[in-house]
């Protein structure tokens, strides 16, 4: 928008014209412009015209009337009034007070240096490059070079840790839907699911209607559906996370557990985990009474009950939360929480420090919670039921900005901190799209519509492939060894304010060239590369290809399902002591190389071990 103003300031130019060109409302654009630039549209345009007018007064002999006309002022008098208000003198007096400016020879273009306003600089940086569709992104970052000797292994290498994956659905009765069950079963075949999390309080389900536990009603009314759900979950081998809170009726909980104890084997009952929501609004006496009533019911009716506390910690300083001063925490079996980087950053204010801290916000928040638990000598497993990296709250920012490497970085970090991590099954159950046109960005969904995999699905898929000892790790590179096999994960992690990023021009400048040399590989190897970036596996660029108003049909969705996956390439290589790869990664791209030895008679391709 600033670039558009800079290019058109010399003619009659209005905010309404810009809003129409950007397909947004004039009022919304006016507020956004003031937030990002610091002044109103009219103030910025006037200052721009006055700056150019002052320059012409000092470097040309043009009359004020001509300068006013060329700089887009409605009249000479308007320019004169505005000029006097800013400089304290009229244009004629301003020219007379600087007589030497006219005679001063203009320096060569290469030697003209002057300060540039931040908004003008950003506008220039954000101008799209005239490039073809097939042109690769512009690499402006310096190449990253790594040379790793596989013989130089750490004395005690750490093993990469994977945490358990929990899949969230909205309500208990969602599990009666055939499409939801089919989607969960297909997901489990690709990514092992540890538990199903029922997000809403389970006793509020419509299945607990009148007569659900009345044996005189046909089939126990809704009990048949409840028994079908929990039997299917047990058959799949999944644990179940059920939510309660201060307002949960203990008598209803007791009736349900009594009936469940009479219909399900102990193994099924032992797979249930109960999460009690801490309420900051309730008094301590009310919280303790509700907690202990429900805890007593669970311990009386279940063979091995598990009851933990869920709490939404404040974005800043979660270690000083009142929850840590409550005696209930010592009675809990685990502590559940969420970590959303978007709650850390106000997108209306450009704050570089907060922007930088949001890159690994989930990890930082979890470490603060762990620290607070250790200070109170509490050793509770930490459950991360929902989380997200920095994004925006619109479809453009949330869907079309690729975040693969940013998600992987956070996943590698939180896996060491939590006992399990949660993801919504799909954006429909998540309720991602809100009525006001914004998006719920507090959590991550594995699928979009019709089971189409979103980027976090493939990040998890790549993450689950990783195994073994960590030989080398930094911000951009992870090298693993497992039973003679090697895995090399490269990533170009980029965090940015989505309100200030233009995908067509700004993001292409984050391409990262790299050169990696692995010293110590001999013999024959099969090398697989999984490449995941904006053009190889990202979902929304593929969806955008369908421009029909009715959207994709069944055949289109099958094509999308086939295409929305990382690119795979395989090569057989005979190596003479090293492997070298020189390439570049786009913004937030991931590249996983897997090295499998190809053994021949009398040949051992693995590098020699340390003496």
Predicted feature locations:
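Noncatalytic carbohydrate-binding groove/subsite architecture in carbohydrate-active enzymes
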Residues: 272, 283-417, 421
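C-terminal active-site-proximal or functional interface alpha/beta core segments in diverse enzymes
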Residues: 379, 388-475, 480-481
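Short amphipathic helical patch at the helix-1/turn junction of helix-turn-helix
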Residues: 9-10, 57-59
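Basic/polar phosphate-binding segments, predominantly the helix-turn-helix DNA-binding elements
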Residues: 4-6, 11-48, 68-90
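Non-catalytic accessory regions flanking glycosidase/transglycosidase catalytic cores in CAZymes
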Residues: 81, 93, 97-273, 282-311, ...
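Short, flexible/disordered intra-domain loops and linkers
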Residues: 208-218, 346-357, 394-401, 436, ...
